[in-house]
A protein has these predicted regions:
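Charged, often low-complexity linker/regulatory segments
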Residues: 1-50, 266
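Short, basic/polar, glycine-containing "phosphate-handling" surface segments that engage DNA
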Residues: 2-13, 74-84, 89-242, 312-333, ...
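Short, hydrophobic/amphipathic alpha-helical patches that form generic packing surfaces
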Residues: 32, 242-259, 337-338, 447-454, ...
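Active-site metal-binding core of divalent-cation-utilizing nuclease and nuclease-like domains
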Residues: 41-81
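Flexible, glycine-/basic-rich loop-and-beta segments that form/coincide
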Residues: 140-150, 629-671
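Segments forming glycine/polar-rich beta-alpha architectures that bind adenosine-containing cofactors
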Residues: 232-265, 269-274, 656-671
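Long recognition/docking surfaces used for binding and targeting
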Residues: 257-344
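SAM-dependent methyltransferase catalytic region
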Residues: 322, 327, 331, 341-611, ...
């Protein structure tokens, strides 16, 4: 049962006895609610009712953390001050906002610096602002009046369905409000929590004001926010998730860039989300953010206060500690992955979005670099200016940064090339490309590439009145569409920045001689953004399956299959030569449904290598052939199970001058 449902049932039952006092009788129900939520946090937070007088009066309760308790004792250590603040409880008939302004709460605040005020139906946090002054922070309202509250309590399941997710997220944030905020993963959790609140506010709300933006996004990205028969709302869910990701990662990106500009200013300087657009360098994200952050769009959806809370959260981050971790190259593992898992785990699963371990990224890029030298007679490998690279599903930019790092190492090894950093920057601008369809990872990819170049001493130039700013070759687009020239006049988009993004991405697709395509394509079938142009990529893998091979039931719907089709047909067909290196679902190696696909690989490529990493929960039970444990290679500290499907790394080379018989090799490994 949901914690809110339990709480409402308990307060309803207490009131129904007719013997309850207006306030104190409900303390146990409130404590149960807070303890149920508090035990899910790390460290856990425990509510203790009726605290001793420490010089400011007798708080109705306090929120403690484990280190404040004696071992094996339910009582706090003598003299322990509640680490997460105290609680002031009033009856449901009283006004929590008036209580928060009273002398008693001010006395508590003067001693404890954080007070949660509640009348059972309203919850209001009194904390401190950047200057250390008393201020009302976040609030949550379960019902507008006492009468409405008791009606809601009489229908606990219905009320919990309407409020449960947002309310529990609110309580978690309250209990974490006084905790030090230094680690990227903790900041990510708060950002995701606010984003979830925002997403819940716009679910089911008509968004006619955003129809123009929706149509422009579909045109710019080369996709349709479509539903399916099984889930008609799937595309709408993706669209709304895209909007929320854009708003919150736009704010986050602006905060990061604002910090870079204020390194030498007073640590007490404050970031303001309303000025975020001034700090965003990527035109597409800047335009999206500007459209979404207009008061006419935010205020009717109730998103202004959520963004105000987000601003307060970012302003209490210890920036020195945060950025010492963030810029060590762990931004993705410790920030984006926890964000997406906490924000929208369903979308993450639908799109098959998983963090790629750095060991895999390093291995694949190194293999590609070696094959360029050995198979295509390019002694400088990735550093050769004729080598154009594309990660068609670049996510947060891990492969792009590793390509640039490898490129820089080659230039340095040639004798300390004095222009090495400049040449790496030139590559990032003009021949190392990434495509991404989700705004949040797209923003992080730009941040990662930008930080890498900055650390090399070749930062991207910012926009000035006299010149256009520089940006990495990472584009927000559907990688699977837009490769063919339009049959009619190109549609003009309402927003120039979106048109510029679309046109730049299409220039890469149609005009750049892509030689290397690598990455970690999505694994799962996701029809929420399907387009007819995508399905054409898979058709060659179905030819003859029924008539020639007698395979009547087959499944080629997973997105990674489309990316193989893209690499084989679109890119190899355009340039006559290509190197493909993907880590993907390993089903294509042996599943009967993929027999035509395997035969096409053997006919279309000259050299092929496959590293089977196993790790499948269904086929191998996550065991090696020797019976040893075989966890997924995608297991991380924050996702210990990894993914269920087995994986494989492919490396396939097609040369302009074809060989008669392809060379192939394979290996089987755990992981």
């Amino acid at each position: 049962m949901h914690p809110l449902e339990i709480y409402l049932k308990e307060v309803h039952d207490i009131r129904a006895t007719g013997a309850a006092t207006p306030e104190t009788a409900y303390y146990p129900a409130l404590a149960n609610l807070l303890n149920e939520v508090g035990k899910t946090l790390k460290p856990k937070v425990k509510c203790i009712i009726s605290l001793k007088n420490r010089g400011a009066g007798l708080p109705d309760g306090g929120l403690f953390t484990p280190e404040q308790f004696q071992k094996s004792s339910p009582k706090p250590l003598p003299g322990a001050t509640p680490a997460r603040g105290v609680i002031e409880v009033k009856s449901a008939s009283e006004d929590a906002w008036l209580t928060a302004e009273g002398e008693q709460v001010s006395r508590y605040w003067g001693k404890y610096r954080q007070v949660l005020v509640t009348n059972l139906r309203d919850f209001l946090l009194v904390g401190q602002d950047a200057e250390g002054s008393q201020v009302k922070l976040e609030a949550y309202r379960l019902a507008d009046s006492e009468a409405d509250f008791w009606k809601a309590a009489a229908q606990p399941r219905k009320t919990a369905a309407a409020h449960g997710e947002r309310f529990v997220e609110y309580l978690k944030r309250i209990m974490l409000q006084a905790a030090p905020l230094t680690a990227p993963k903790d900041v990510a959790w708060f950002l995701a929590s606010y984003a979830r609140d925002a997403k819940a506010r716009i679910e089911g709300v008509a968004l006619p004001a955003l129809d123009t933006l929706r149509n422009a996004l579909e045109e710019a990205l080369g996709l349709k926010f479509e539903g399916t028969k099984a889930d008609p709302d799937k595309g709408e869910h993706f669209f709304r998730s895209t909007l929320v990701q854009t708003i919150f990662y736009g704010v986050f990106s602006a905060w990061v860039l604002w910090h870079k500009k204020h390194l030498h200013l007073n640590p007490k300087d404050r970031f303001h989300w309303r000025e975020a657009a001034w700090h965003l360098h990527v035109p597409m994200i800047k335009a999206l953010f500007e459209q979404l952050s207009l008061p006419s769009k935010l205020e009717p959806l109730g998103l202004v206060e959520v963004l105000d809370w987000t601003e307060t959260c970012l302003n209490r981050v210890s920036r020195a500690d945060f950025f010492s971790h963030f810029e060590e190259g762990h931004a993705v593992q410790y920030f984006y992955e926890p964000f997406l898992e906490a924000f929208d785990p369903k979308l993450r699963k639908d799109l098959g979005v998983w963090y790629t371990p750095p060991e895999i990224v390093h291995y694949m890029v190194a293999r590609v670099d070696a094959v360029l030298r050995q198979e295509l007679d390019l002694p400088d490998g990735l550093a050769d200016p004729r080598v154009y690279v594309l990660d068609p599903c670049c996510g947060t930019g891990a492969y792009l940064v590793e390509v640039l790092r490898r490129l820089h190492a080659t230039l340095q090894a040639r004798g300390g090339d004095g222009l090495a950093a400049h040449k790496v920057k030139l590559a990032a601008l003009s021949r190392v490309f990434g495509f991404e369809i989700m705004p949040a990872p797209f923003v992080v990819a730009h941040l990662q590439v930008g930080l890498f170049l900055q650390n090399l001493g070749a930062p991207l130039a910012e926009e000035t009145p006299a010149r256009k700013g520089e940006r990495a070759g990472v584009y927000l687009t559907n990688a699977l569409t837009g490769w063919e020239p339009p049959t009619g006049p190109k549609k003009q988009l309402l927003f120039p920045e979106m048109q510029e993004e679309r046109d730049a991405a299409e220039e890469v697709k149609r005009d750049k001689p892509i030689l290397v395509i690598l990455g970690n394509p999505p694994y799962n079938a996701f029809a929420g953004v399907s387009a007819a142009a995508e399905k054409i990529l898979v058709e060659p893998y179905k030819e003859g399956l029924v008539k020639k091979w007698g395979i009547k039931k087959f499944n080629l719907d997973d997105l990674y299959v489309r990316f193989f089709g893209l690499a084989e047909r679109r890119i190899a067909g355009m340039t006559g030569k290509v190197i493909v290196s993907f880590i993907s679902n390993f089903s294509y190696l042996g599943d009967p449904s993929f027999v035509v696909m395997r035969r096409r690989f053997l006919s279309e490529f000259d050299s092929l290598w496959f590293d089977c990493l196993n790790g499948d929960s269904r086929e191998t039970g996550k065991l090696t052939p020797e019976g040893k444990p075989d966890p997924s290679v995608f297991s991380t500290e924050y996702n210990k199970e990894g993914i269920r499907v087995g994986t494989a790394v492919c490396l396939m080379v097609r040369q302009k001058k074809r060989r008669g018989t392809p060379r192939s090799a394979s290996g089987i490994f755990g992981g």
